[in-house]
């Protein structure tokens, strides 16, 4: 069992039960999945760029991502429907908790001029989105072996009904919000 998974059962659940006055343990919000998405627009001209992005994301997530394809053709961007233009991976279960642990304890503190994560990334339904500008904040990526700095979107999906519940859940996991 992942360290944060045990922490959730032992520390977070009792804290949120008390804070929100839930009647059942099953009402307590939990993280259901974490989705990593990387758009690689340069992949239109060079297929090697997408392969490198998939390699980076495989190292970060510990799971092979799927290539995302363009839904429709856009002449201005020189893309056709069906062209691979990015990659994404969905993490659940122990892998999700391991990634979240690395994100909170190792990766986010390595961001340059890091002062905390803005609380405006909630979507109104208890899910949180954040963007990372460069993949080198993760210790699995070696700075010398990357071809380009690429950002990614990290989407944390929870069972929380409101943003307040989701914020309390992530704060209980020591997520570094700005005050």
From Swiss-Prot:
GO MF entries: rRNA binding; structural constituent of ribosome; tRNA binding
Disulfide links within the chain: none
UniProt-listed InterPro entries: Ribosomal_uL5, Ribosomal_uL5_bac-type, Ribosomal_uL5_C, Ribosomal_uL5_CS, Ribosomal_uL5_dom_sf, Ribosomal_uL5_N
Alphabetized UniProt keyword annotations: Ribonucleoprotein, Ribosomal protein, RNA-binding, rRNA-binding, tRNA-binding
GO cellular component entries: ribonucleoprotein complex; ribosome
SUPFAM superfamilies reported in the protein's UniProt record: RL5-like
Example GO biological process: translation
Function: This is one of the proteins that bind and probably mediate the attachment of the 5S RNA into the large ribosomal subunit, where it forms part of the central protuberance. In the 70S ribosome it contacts protein S13 of the 30S subunit (bridge B1b), connecting the 2 subunits; this bridge is implicated in subunit movement. Contacts the P site tRNA; the 5S rRNA and some of its associated proteins might help stabilize positioning of ribosome-bound tRNAs.
Protein family: Belongs to the universal ribosomal protein uL5 family.
Subunit structure: Part of the 50S ribosomal subunit; part of the 5S rRNA/L5/L18/L25 subcomplex. Contacts the 5S rRNA and the P site tRNA. Forms a bridge to the 30S subunit in the 70S ribosome.
Protein name according to UniProt: Large ribosomal subunit protein uL5
Native source species: Azoarcus sp. (strain BH72)
Native organism taxonomy: Bacteria, Pseudomonadati, Pseudomonadota, Betaproteobacteria, Rhodocyclales
């Amino acid at each position: 069992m992942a360290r944060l998974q045990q922490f959730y059962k032992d520390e977070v659940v009792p804290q949120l039960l008390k804070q929100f006055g839930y009647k059942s343990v099953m009402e307590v919000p939990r993280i259901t999945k974490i989705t990593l998405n990387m758009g690689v627009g340069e992949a239109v001209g060079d297929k090697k760029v997408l392969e490198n992005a998939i390699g980076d994301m495989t190292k970060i997530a510990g799971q092979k991502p799927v290539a995302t394809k363009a839904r429709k053709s856009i002449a201005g961007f020189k893309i056709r429907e069906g062209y691979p233009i990015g990659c994404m991976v969905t993490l659940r279960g122990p892998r999700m908790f391991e990634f979240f642990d690395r994100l909170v304890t190792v990766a986010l503190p390595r961001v340059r001029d890091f002062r905390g994560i803005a609380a405006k990334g909630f979507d109104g339904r208890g899910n949180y989105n954040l963007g990372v500008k460069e993949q080198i904040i993760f210790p699995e990526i070696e700075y010398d072996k990357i071809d380009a700095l690429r950002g990614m979107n990290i989407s944390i999906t929870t069972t929380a009904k409101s943003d307040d519940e989701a914020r309390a859940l992530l704060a209980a996991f020591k997520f570094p919000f700005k005050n």
